[in-house]
Amino acid sequence: NLIDAIKTPIHGTSYVFVLSPSYKRPKHVKNLIAMESKLQDPVTYEHWALEVAGIKDTLVHTCTEYKKLGYRLIGYGAAAKGMTLLNYTHLPLEYIIDDNPLKQKKYSPGMNIPIVSSDCLDTLKDTDKVMFIPLAWNFFKEIRAKIVEKRSNPDDRFVRYFPEVRVEY
């Protein structure tokens, strides 16, 4: 029997489940089970679809406006979740930076965006204004720290898109 569930931040959100032959369930586990039961209701997915479409529209609009202001759009992290985002939004990224040599010198599926090493950060001019889109959104802080360590342009921007679109400096 499920007697506890612990929410963790791994991969956006994961759970550790505690099982026991006893059957006394804490209130937060009962609440979690009640919340999970909503996954059987199509209305849950209709609301979710509207939320996702809103994030997409805001992200595309934000990136388009920054591109009009002369910003270069560069992705970081060729994670599967990022490829899903790109194929849904069709963001016109110049390239995607990834630290994994097995992904470098390849192209993103569907969008055919070149995947390059982080050495390309050294080739950017000091005058280049860049909007970085961390495609592995759950590693936003780590990706941002890597970029800032190599490049410190006060005009650069970083865009979060989950759970909402937010531009950071």
What is the role of each PLM region?
Residues 84-96:
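Substrate-recognition/cap helix-loop segment adjacent to the acidic, metal-dependent catalytic center
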Residues 72, 95, 130-131:
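Structural motif
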Residues 1-11:
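Conserved S-adenosyl-L-methionine
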Residues 112-169:
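Phosphate-bearing ligand-interacting subdomains
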